[in-house]
């Protein structure tokens, strides 16, 4: 049997209990992991998953560092780590400007903020043992930082054609470390109608293409022409053209 992928799982109001039932089913089906995006409360969902599952690995992917105080993050992460018997991975990131603005928050400098957060997290007193810390990374400086201070990293929508170049910034020892986690969240639509599936994914990726961080990554990955065309469409408020690119 081929290795099963991990699944992204979010809990929305009114369906939280059903989501936990689904987590149990995901484990029974043999999937390799459950990762909770920043949609909703990924820490609360992870805490519940720790208690309803037995063996599957799971984690946040990601928990924005600005949403809570560092000590609160450390306490919750340690609790989940302990109650899951080490199955939890604490994925963190800076999120995106529009998402922070919607919550009345303002981000800072991604690299220095992540470095400070991880340092303070590890120094938090009397919280207990911490889980592996996974950094959300897209571009090379954050990837290098993950290799320096983290236990892994997670991409989102990363191009396979650019992956080798991205990973080349890691040290040889980090690349060989089986405990260093490398993940890539990929929106997936399964259908016998290939064109319909493509249309769904284009619609899904449109929201990512609206964000500067992703466009900058895709430019680095070689899609300069497409990203510049999208930027022109955004500037002209011709949003319906974005899926075309």
Where are these regions (language model features)?
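Active-site-adjacent structural elements that line small-molecule/cofactor binding pockets in enzymes
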Residues: 1-245
């Amino acid at each position: 049997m081929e290795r099963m992928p991990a699944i992204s799982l979010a809990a929305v109001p009114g369906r939280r209990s059903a989501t936990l039932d689904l987590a149990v089913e995901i484990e029974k089906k043999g999937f390799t992991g459950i990762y909770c995006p920043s949609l909703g409360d990924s820490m609360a969902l992870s805490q519940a998953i720790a208690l309803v599952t037995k063996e599957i690995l799971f984690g946040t992917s990601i928990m924005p560092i600005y949403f809570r105080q560092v000590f609160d993050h450390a306490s919750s992460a340690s609790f989940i780590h302990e109650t899951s018997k080490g199955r939890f991975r604490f994925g963190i990131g800076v999120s995106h400007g529009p998402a922070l603005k919607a919550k009345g928050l303002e981000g800072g400098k991604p690299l220095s903020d992540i470095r400070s957060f991880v340092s303070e997290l590890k120094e938090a007193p009397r919280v207990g043992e911490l889980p592996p810390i996974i950094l959300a990374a897209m571009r090379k400086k954050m990837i290098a930082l993950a290799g320096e201070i983290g236990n892994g990293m997670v991409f989102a929508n990363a191009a396979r054609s650019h992956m080798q170049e991205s990973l080349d910034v890691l040290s040889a020892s980090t690349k060989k470390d089986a405990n260093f986690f490398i993940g890539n969240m990929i929106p997936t639509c399964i259908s016998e109608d290939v064109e319909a599936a493509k249309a769904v994914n284009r619609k899904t990726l449109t929201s990512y293409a609206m964000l500067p961080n992703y466009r900058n990554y895709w430019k680095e990955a070689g899609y300069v022409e497409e990203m510049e065309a999208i930027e022109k469409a955004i500037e002209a408020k011709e949003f319906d053209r974005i899926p075309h690119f």
